[in-house]
Amino acid sequence: MTDLTTPIRTPEDADAALRPKTLAEFVGQAAARENLRIFIEAAKARGDALDHVLFFGPPGLGKTTLAQIVARELGVGFRSTSGPVIAKAGDLAALLTNLEDGDVLFIDEIHRLSPAVEEILYPAMEDRALDIMIGEGPSARSVRIDLPQFTLVGATTRQGLLTTPLRDRFGIPVRLNFYTHAELEQVIGRAARLLGLAIAPDGALEIAKRSRGTPRIAGRLLRRVRDFAAVAGHAIVDARAADAALNRLEVDALGLDAMDRRYLTMIADIYRGGPVGVETLAAGLSEPRDTIEDVIEPYLLQIGLIARTARGRTLNASAWKHLGLNPPAGSQDGLFDK
């Protein structure tokens, strides 16, 4: 049977050494962090398994890292898998029956579980038991298997795609938000120390401002800036060195990359600022709809460059200004700017 969990390092874990190991080391998400600390301490004091946890929010904000930290703070085992990997109900049953008492089972992209697998998960989460059908036809019978006390930690970028029965079984829903520049400066400073890279405060701020409020992107940009600085012979990464490297990576002052600018330019040039539907944009950009909705749009919405309306996506005045273009005559921005 194909391994459902991933015990070896994957490409996504290339920065595993930079990840915080405890809640105290974790930067940002202050309210979520404090609540988790309280829930973990309470569960340990009672001697119970922590209630099931759901992390949701845009990609790259630390959902997987927090799941690992939860297991480490509880002092229990950690097993990791993802929704698309669990193809059959039997796959999930195999995972659950191999858990030890108190273990944390992390399911990334939990919104992509199939309905059949999800049905198995309900009694497992609620009653710590599995209901399995044995046999077929008139002779089929249901057998209940007791499971160890465990904590399911789910992660999703699309909370709205979770079914209500599944969502309601998570006792601890935790929303993760984009990071501030100050928080990202701390993330970058810590990562630079671990990488042995000398970085000036203004250099860390320059990278932070272009990291789209996302620690994963901040770490990736920091490593690329390190490469440019090493080849250029910079002993310390200051704002000037960071700016030069990021410009070569085509990451602009707002943190937008080439794909973001293609998205904005398409709405501006072809659709006169919108509204335009997401399926049309996906076809024009040759990108899946999920990429548009999960990767490109959240940050553009966060910084106010675009708006989602019932009729489709539209550009706000700040987007026209960033592109260096004037809204077409008769557009909403053009009317309200007068």
From Swiss-Prot:
Catalyses: ATP + H2O = ADP + phosphate + H(+)
Q: GO annotations under biological process? A: DNA recombination; DNA repair
Map out region (Head domain (RuvB-H)) in residue numbers.
253-338
Q: Which InterPro entries match?
A: AAA+_ATPase, AAA_lid_4, DNA_helicase_Holl-junc_RuvB, P-loop_NTPase, RuvB-like_N, RuvB_C, WH-like_DNA-bd_sf, WH_DNA-bd_sf
SMART domains listed in its UniProt record? AAA
For this UniProt entry, what is the primary localization, expressed as one broad class?
cytoplasm
Give binding positions for Mg(2+). Answer: 64
Annotated GO MF terms: ATP binding; ATP hydrolysis activity; four-way junction DNA binding; four-way junction helicase activity
The record's section on Pfam families has: AAA_lid_4, RuvB_C, RuvB_N
What keywords are assigned to this protein?
ATP-binding, Cytoplasm, DNA damage, DNA recombination, DNA repair, DNA-binding, Hydrolase, Nucleotide-binding
Q: Where does ATP bind?
A: 18-19, 60, 63-65, 169, 179, 216
Q: Where is this region: Large ATPase domain (RuvB-L)?
A: 1-179
Q: What Enzyme Commission number(s) does the record list for this chain?
A: 3.6.4.-
Q: Which GO terms describe its cellular component?
A: cytoplasm; Holliday junction resolvase complex
Compartment(s) where it occurs, according to its Swiss-Prot or TrEMBL record: Cytoplasm
**Region Small ATPAse domain (RuvB-S), residue ranges:** 180-250
The job of this chain, per UniProt, is described as: The RuvA-RuvB-RuvC complex processes Holliday junction (HJ) DNA during genetic recombination and DNA repair, while the RuvA-RuvB complex plays an important role in the rescue of blocked DNA replication forks via replication fork reversal (RFR). RuvA specifically binds to HJ cruciform DNA, conferring on it an open structure. The RuvB hexamer acts as an ATP-dependent pump, pulling dsDNA into and through the RuvAB complex. RuvB forms 2 homohexamers on either side of HJ DNA bound by 1 or 2 RuvA tetramers; 4 subunits per hexamer contact DNA at a time.
The entry sums up its family as follows: Belongs to the RuvB family.
Entry text on domains: Has 3 domains, the large (RuvB-L) and small ATPase (RuvB-S) domains and the C-terminal head (RuvB-H) domain. The head domain binds DNA, while the ATPase domains jointly bind ATP, ADP or are empty depending on the state of the subunit in the translocation cycle. During a single DNA translocation step the structure of each domain remains the same, but their relative positions change.
Q: What is this protein called?
A: Holliday junction branch migration complex subunit RuvB
List the source organism.
Sphingopyxis alaskensis (strain DSM 13593 / LMG 18877 / RB2256)
* Gene name in the database record: ruvB
